[in-house]
A protein has these predicted regions:
Chain B
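An N-terminal assembly and electron-transfer interface module characteristic of large anaerobic redox
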Residues: 1-503
Length: 426, 503
């Protein structure tokens, strides 16, 4: 059940699904939804992800039935049929996904029968059942992946050096492109080819043939369980779940070893690790003591919360006080996995771990800890830091006061950027 | 109390899906022979809930309860960002977030109703912040399932200290986002002002301004009013319950935006005897003069305002002359909201530019006045009555090849055309100072188009090459439905496109 939430850090299921489709090259989402859903979802996801708009179709350029009272009463399938026809006529695209909003979901328009009319003619038009009320952004992310698996992915012969990299959600992770790029750079050094679906203008073809992969790497402590299981069941692609964004030498090297272990690339991995760690420490040793010691709190999605907490505690010797995970985690085993990642640290005393999405409750939780001198969070959290006069660094969704292109905090290189940004914020 | 429904489509002779040449449209409108029409294919709109929320989100002693699934606060992030920047521009030491609480309607609530959750959310708002006002926004979902937001608000009247103001801004009620402003004011009237008259305060003017007005613009407009000895009650941006309550004590009202508070000002005149000036947006010399004279006339300051205008002209006209030399004869395509599109069109006249295309969301009696005025200056130009619809915009702009596009640049910049716009919510655009800022901005962009030119070589637009050859208005269909003014949408019966020719 979705709880009443102040200052939510997410959009609806429709917004989450759209974040995925709008990040795929030459794909057009079509909304069967109210007038405004296009803007609300784009503003809610991409707009809060470092202030950009998806390049192909987004916001008010998204085809939409703009359902009004008449459609609520009489149904909107005729309107939808016209809208799909119009979209097919004017857009250059490899696939069209028809996304349901609350209005069509509540009045139960039969979207699939309309999209079937088009797919029967061989046109790539697919239904996605994602009305906003089904849940938050992550629900939409899961629905979108299920839909890609249902409609796009086909079996392909195994390619031993191909991996799929999942778990980093477009836009909902404002640094998704940079994070993908850094992890892909590292995996390519292992001699692998990497599908992300979303970067380097990969598109429908990469998704269709993703069943050829030797391994699915899911960088998230809780997302895409169903999708990973389906890949395994339908195409025999096994998965490696990596719980949290690897940031810095320690976690990234562990990540590299884990991947290499699964694919029999051990020797090569050690060479990559040696080279990359030398690169990182080559820089770190030029700014020793540049940042004074901090007692820090993290307020972020689970991937960022784990990555930042572990890097600052294990690799940078800052003192973790509390980490607040803002994802709406509902499975107890996921909470346990996340808590383990956050508390099994090398030398540092583990931080308090709290799961909370409500802005007011997050502030009260922070109140209960004394002597926090650094708050790593989102734009939402700047207010708290200002009030208390503590340093604040904005590295997690929602971000509306920074422009983000390809910046990353992931991997080896990203950890250096994180330290740079912490210094800038002094 | 208001008799106006808050739905802009219900106003007489109002069109939202139309395209053609300005002379033909003006003639058709004059003869009352424009038929009702609709687009059989359309891109996304802005819903009225977005406008209702953005209008109020900087009220300092308020909490905003949104009765909706979580997606319906997506655009609140824009409003909150503007609010945060606005606080910074006002020099506030601690920059706050707007207090937004969403009931997060889910599947269970859709089936069983969400009134319990709404009640709880209002109590939470009250307990956390003890605000003076709690605004409750409806959504498509809450409206369709029939949740009674008035009933919940009413039942809590004795329990919470705040005034609870329910706003009926369900997105499906209107395709015109400006309806959301009206809906918000209707509720403020009903729940805050309640028809109570107050003693008048001399020289006090209600100055209604939407969120899109920058701090610099507020300062300029307030300066202009102060010169006339007028005190502005600036509403509802950065205002408070106290300022709302002062509304009935004003001697006059005016608005900075043409579609903001216009219906509300009529109501204030009828119910509280407050006359109002509803002219134009104060952008460009002609419009700023016109706007200024309108306000001055309310207070019998016609002579004073002429003196000030003369002095302002003496100050800015020589500088405008310099800008005019850089812009004279340049062909321009303008896209904007109702107020801004026409204001920009008047502005380009100050600089001797030639209007070749205009995209504006509504064609009605007010628009007709502007179009007729512009027809007199520019002859014939293309009019696209659309709220954005980027597919039509890029089609028209590619064919018309203007020297500059004024509007949201996201799409036309990729065609390599210099772009700029007059909706810069964090920077100046208004009054006499704003003219210089805008003029230099337009001229600088035209003279230095490198970014867009290089961008066009690499950037992608999602449309087929064939679309650019097609009739931009081919999806606009007239139909034998109800006359304009009726809200329901009869299915377009594959009728004739309105006017086909685009030069």
């Amino acid at each position: 059940m979705s709880a009443i939430t102040e200052a939510p850090r997410g959009n609806c299921a429709l917004g989450g699904a759209n974040a995925v489709f709008s990040a795929i090259d030459r794909v057009v989402p079509i909304y069967h939804a109210g007038p405004g859903c296009c803007m609300q979802t784009t503003a809610g996801e991409a707009g809060q992800a470092g202030g950009r708009s998806p390049f192909y179709v987004s916001g008010v350029s998204t085809p939409c039935t703009n359902m009004l009272e008449h459609d609520v009463v009489f149904g909107g399938v005729d309107r939808l049929r016209e809208t799909i026809s119009g979209a097919l006529e004017i857009f250059e695209a490899d696939a069209f996904f028809v996304l349901e909003g609350c209005t069509s979901g509540i009045i139960a328009d039969d979207v699939k029968s309309v999209t079937d009319e088009f797919s029967a003619k061989g046109l790539p038009v697919y239904p996605v059942d994602c009305p906003g009320f089904l849940g938050e952004s992550y629900r939409g992310y899961e629905i979108a992946f299920a839909s890609l698996l249902d409609h796009v992915v086909q079996s392909a012969p195994r390619e031993g050096d191909l991996v799929n990299l999942f778990g980093i959600m477009p836009y909902h992770d404002p640094f998704w492109e940079g994070n993908f790029e850094e992890l892909i750079r590292i995996l390519e050094k292992l001699g692998l080819r990497v599908n992300s679906f979303f970067t380097r203008r990969q598109g429908i073809a990469a998704i269709r043939d993703s069943s050829a992969a030797a391994l699915n790497i899911v960088v998230s402590p809780w997302l895409l369980k169903d999708a990973a299981a389906k890949y395994e069941e339908r195409f025999g692609v096994p998965s490696l779940r990596w719980s949290g964004l690897p940031i810095g030498a320690t976690d990234t090297s562990a990540f590299v070893r884990a991947v290499a272990d699964r694919l029999g690339l051990k020797d090569r991995a050690e060479r990559v690790i040696a080279e990359e760690e030398a690169y990182v420490y080559g820089y770190l040793e030029t700014a020793i003591g540049a940042l004074s010691w901090k007692r820090f709190a993290v307020v972020a999605d689970s991937n960022t919360a784990i990555g930042v907490t572990r890097f600052l505690a294990n690799d940078y010797s800052f003192t973790p006080i509390v980490t607040i995970v803002t994802d709406p985690i509902f499975r107890p085993e996921d909470k346990e996995r996340i808590t383990r990642q956050l508390t099994e640290l090398e030398h540092a005393k583990p931080p308090a771990v709290v799961f909370e999405t409500d802005g007011w409750k997050i502030a009260r939780e922070l109140d209960s800890h004394s002597e926090i001198t650094l708050l790593v969070g989102s734009t939402n959290d700047r207010e708290y830091a200002m009030e208390k006069g503590i340093q604040c660094s904005v590295v997690a969704y929602p971000i509306t006061d920074r422009l983000v292109f390809n910046r990353t905090y992931a991997g080896y290189r990203g950890s250096l950027t994180l330290v740079e940004d912490l210094y800038d914020n002094l | 109390m208001s008799e106006y429904s808050g739905i802009r489509e219900r106003r007489p002779f109002s069109y939202h899906d139309l395209g053609g040449q300005s002379q033909g449209l003006a003639e058709g409108f004059r003869k009352r022979c424009l038929k009702a029409s609709d687009r059989s294919f359309s891109q996304g709109l802005q819903c009225q809930e977005i406008n209702s929320m953005s209008a109020l989100m900087s009220m300092e002693d308020s909490v905003f309860v949104v009765h909706a699934p979580q997606g319906c606060v997506g655009c609140a992030s824009f409003a909150n960002d503007l609010y945060r920047v606005g606080q910074a521009h006002r020099g506030l030491p601690i920059i706050r977030n707007a207090r937004i609480i969403v009931t997060n309607l889910d599947e269970k609530d859709i089936i069983h109703g969400g009134e319990g959750k709404l009640r709880e959310a209002i109590l939470i708002a009250n307990e956390r912040y003890a605000p003076k006002l709690i605004f409750v926004f409806a959504s498509c979902a809450s409206g369709i399932i029939g949740d009674d937001i008035d009933g919940v608000a009413h039942s809590l009247a004795g329990e919470v200290g705040a005034i609870v103001v329910p706003i009926h801004c369900e997105g499906f009620k209107s395709k015109v986002c400006a309806s959301g402003f009206d809906t918000a004011f209707i509720s403020i009237s009903k729940h805050v002002l309640k028809g109570e008259r107050l003693p008048k305060q001399k020289n006090l003017v209600n100055l209604f301004a939407p969120t899109s007005v920058s701090r610099k613009d507020q300062v300029e407009i307030e300066r202009m009013l102060a010169v006339l000895g007028l005190e502005a009650n600036y509403l509802p941006f950065y205002s408070s319950l106290e300022k709302l309550k002062r509304i009935p004590s004003a001697e006059g009202s005016t608005a900075i935006c043409k579609v903001f508070a216009d219906e509300f000002m009529k109501e204030l005149e009828r119910d509280y005897g407050i006359p109002f000036a509803h002219t134009v947006m104060p952008i460009g010399v002609r419009n700023t003069d016109k706007w200024y004279r309108g306000v001055a006339a309310l207070f019998g300051k016609e002579a004073e305002v002429e003196e000030v205008i003369a002095a302002e002209h003496e100050r800015v006209l020589p500088q405008i002359e310099g800008i005019r030399k850089r812009l004279e004869g340049k062909r321009v395509f303008i896209c904007g909201g109702t107020g801004r599109s026409f204001a920009a069109a008047a502005l380009v006249d100050d600089f001797g530019m030639r209007l070749v295309g205009l995209e504006t969301p509504t064609y009605d009696e007010d628009a007709q006045l502007d179009i007729e005025y512009l027809n007199g200056i520019h002859g014939d130009f293309v009019v696209d009555v659309a709220n954005m619809q980027p597919f039509e915009q890029v089609n028209l702009v590619k064919k018309l090849k203007p020297d500059v596009f004024i509007g949201v640049p996201t799409w036309t910049a990729r065609l390599g055309i210099p772009t700029t716009h007059v909706l810069d919510m964090k920077r100046p655009t208004m009054g006499y100072d704003g003219i210089l800022y805008l003029g230099n901005k337009i001229a600088d962009q035209i003279e230095n188009p490198g970014f867009n030119e290089k961008l066009a070589a690499h950037a992608r637009l999602p449309y087929k090459a064939s679309w650019y050859e097609d009739d931009a208005f081919k999806f606009i269909k007239t139909f034998a439905g109800p006359a304009p003014g009726a809200v329901s949408r009869a299915a377009p019966a594959g009728g004739e496109p309105v006017i086909r020719e685009v030069r």
